[in-house]
Structure formats: C-alpha cells, structure tokens
Amino acid sequence: MNSPIPFQKEYQHADALVQLLLSRGLAIDNPSKAEQYLKTINYYRLSAYMYPLLLVPKSEHRFKTDANFRQVMMLYRFDKKLRLFMFNEIEKIEIAVRTAIVDECTSAFGDSFWMTNASYFIDSNKFLKTLVLLKHEVEKSREEFIAHFKHTYSDPYPPAWILAELIPLGVMVNIFNNLKNAQVKKRIALRFGLQLKVFNSWMTIITLTRNSCCHHARVWNKQNTMLPMVPHRTTHAWITLPSNPLRVYYNLCIIKYFLDTISPNNDMGKKLRDLLSAFLLVDPAPMGFPEGWENEELWEIG
C-alpha cells in the first residue's frame, strides 16, 4: 500500500478543463458550450458522469473511442430527473409515515405530548438530543400555526401532531426507533404491510435516498451505504427477480412498495417507464434493473 502524499494538483478553469478533456480523447462538438457548462457545474461533480465513458484501467483517464461530451450531459440530466422523480414519490411516503407514527402513538399513549416525554423512549441520551432539536425547531419556526400556539397556550411544546410538521424525516425515524413500546411500533409497520425489522431497514434507505435527493447528490449509479433487509413476508406485491439490493433499482422498488400500501392506484410505474423511455441511451444495468423488471407484479400495478 502506497503512503499518502500531499495534494498538489492545481485548480483549473473551465477553458483549461475543456482542453484537458479533449487531450484525454473525449469528443466535444461545441467547446465553447462545454466551457459554459463547466463554469456553472463543478468539474468534479460532472466527472462522476464521465467515469462510465473511460477505458479500463480508468486510472489512466482515457476515454472510449465513441465517448462524447453530449453523453456526459445526457447522464447528468437523467440523474437530475431521476432525483426529482424519487423525491416527489418519497414525499408521499414521508407524509404517510409521519401521520401513522403520530396517530398510533397518540392513540396508544393517550398523551398529546408524548413526543417530548422521556418516559416513552428507550435511550434517554437520544431522547435529550431529539428534545434539543425539537426546541430549536420550535424557536426558529416562522410558521403561523407555531406563532398561534405560542400566543394561545402555556405549554412549552406543541402536541406531537404539530411537532411532526416541523422535523425532518430522519428525526422522525429516530424518534420511532427510540420508542419503548414494541407493540405500537409493530402496528405502525403493519400499516405499511411490513414486519418491524424490515420497516426499520427500509425507512433508513428511504431517508438516505431522500437526503441524497435533497442535497442534489448523484443517485443514478450510486450504491447504498447499507444493505436493506430482504422481506420474507409482505402483504403487497414484491419483486421476484434477483436484484442487487445496493443499487437504485432496489430503492425504487422499496418506494413503489410503500406507495402501493398508501395509494394502490398510484402511477409511479408509468412515470418511471416514461422517464427511462425519454433517455433510451442510458443503460439501466448499472442502476441494478434486471432484465424483465417491468413484468414484475410490483411494477405492473400503476
């Protein structure tokens, strides 16, 4: 293993980067237009979409003979549209999961303020960290419903159904995971036709995917940083073809499964097929799509 060395590469401006790409064998039909793109899109960000076009060994940074800058921008645009598509679908899941957690917990505990009551949680340190975050969200909020609550009521925190509107999905999932009452958690998971462990795993995947979409990160050929659980039993259709659970296709399947429990007549399948049809030159294989995926029962619905 080589010893680490100091970083000594110099920063290069857009015009120099265009020349660098040309020297490495990338065809650029309109260098001035490519230069404009590189002035608005960080080269390091764009290089992720160049990587599939490199010859092996990729460390030599030589492009395949048919590689063109147009392909780079096509992959970039496809990834952007995929990101927006996934985010829009996840939004529906986020709202449904928040509602399920608040509904089941408030009904079971008979306490409107359970979210800020330590007695309902396993780990007191995690609870305190969450409480600090909740306090911060309430204090900084400019929402009219928060202003109304502060003006009208003497309680230090709003009830759970109001707090749920202020916090990110990741925090809501952490609150769920820290709940003491296992039966309540099982009931929440069953609302989405899942066993508790699978629900926990899949909600983590959905949260990580949502965060990638929010931060404009690459999702097209990115691998999951954790392995999602494979369900043994589901109440709705699930995939049967062998699929790589680390690839975005598996994430899309998880999203579709949740949507089928929330809105059985959803059109996610149609929208995904339309997106792929609009970018026929994008190879679905690096995303983990198996041959015949569109014939799965999961994707035949909607």
Q: What do these predicted regions represent?
A:
Residues M1-L208, W220-G302:
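Extended intrinsically disordered or low-complexity regions, especially N/C-terminal cytosolic tails and loops
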Residues H216:
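Acidic/aromatic/glycine-rich contiguous surface patches that form carbohydrate-binding/processing clefts
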